[in-house]
From Swiss-Prot:
It comes from Treponema pallidum (strain Nichols). Coiled coil: none annotated. This is UPF0178 protein TP_0845. Residues 155-177 are annotated as: Disordered. PANTHER family: UPF0178 PROTEIN YAII. Disulfide bonds: none annotated. Belongs to the UPF0178 family. InterPro entries: UPF0178.
Length: 177
């Protein structure tokens, strides 16, 4: 399992929580952004800096995330692409995006975008607080536990364990144990 983070607008507290989860689970967390982002120094955390163009980080995540991974993003359009690829995705407030709720979320996003474009709604984002961090941490724990259970079931069926671990150079290697 790889934890993918759309790091361009990800709160620092969320980055720390993801880094701790990656260390606890022994997996890799890839923070993808089109500019350098400060990270927790850990062999489990990898910064992926894309070209400094719009949507480059999103395209990278879409191209490399796989079933069994978890993506963290607040970008609804990216979340829809990830859900459509049958990959688990949550936002930085702990909301889990699914096939059942992503269309509604995208519709609300588009409606609010239109209202803001017409000057009928202010551009506001509530500050990220302790409750948000706790809710995110709970959601992250639930989703990673679910993904680990699914991976164990697949391993039991195939008899092979797939793992993704960081090498000494900090790059990820995939192999069989």
């Amino acid at each position: 399992m790889t934890l993918w983070v759309d790091a361009d607008s990800c709160p620092a507290r969320v980055r720390v929580l993801v880094a701790r989860a990656a260390a606890r689970l022994g997996c890799v967390a890839r923070f993808v952004a089109n500019r350098p982002i400060p990270l927790v120094q850990s062999p489990h955390c990898i910064m992926v800096e894309t070209q400094p163009v719009d949507q480059a980080a999103d395209r990278h995540i879409i191209a490399y995330a796989r079933a069994g991974d978890l993506v963290v993003t607040r970008d609804i359009v990216l979340a829809k692409a990830i859900v459509d690829a049958r990959i688990s995705v949550i936002n930085d407030r702990g909301d889990v995006y699914t096939e059942e709720n992503i269309r509604e979320r995208l519709s609300v996003r588009n409606f609010m975008y239109d209202l803001r474009g017409q000057g009928l709604a202010p551009e506001t984002t509530s500050p990220f607080g302790r409750r948000d961090a706790a809710r995110f941490a709970d959601s992250l724990d639930r989703e990673t536990a679910k993904l680990l259970r699914l991976a164990r079931r697949r391993e039991a069926k195939t008899g092979e364990e797939q793992c993704d671990w960081p090498s000494a150079q900090g790059k990820s290697q995939t192999g069989r144990r």
